[in-house]
């Protein structure tokens, strides 16, 4: 899976300012015909425990064609809570 914010490829463990990720990213992945996928984006470092920022279900060949079970919310960690990781997971 590849994640792009503003057409820029984001590498694993790459630091982004929250302002650079306020809009839905583009997700590219190899897919198989006749299979459905689910995409999760979450912040395991939230002060309230694991917090989901985006859930898309019933994805066929493009995330844009899936159903938003949870609308995208960009990163906005509270001040003085350290660096937060935002993890994308794709399930068949």
Identify the residue ranges that each predicted region occupies.
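N-terminus-centered regions that define maturation/targeting leaders and the start
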Residues: 1-92
């Amino acid at each position: 899976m590849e994640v792009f914010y503003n057409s820029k490829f984001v590498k694993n463990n790459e630091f982004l300012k929250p302002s650079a990720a306020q809009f839905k990213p583009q997700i590219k992945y190899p897919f198989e015909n006749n299979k459905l996928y689910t995409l999760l984006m979450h912040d395991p470092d939230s002060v309230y425990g694991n917090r989901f920022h985006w859930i898309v279900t019933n994805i066929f060949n493009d995330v844009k064609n899936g159903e938003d079970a949870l609308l995208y919310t960009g990163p906005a960690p509270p001040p003085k809570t350290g660096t937060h990781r935002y993890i994308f997971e794709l399930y068949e």
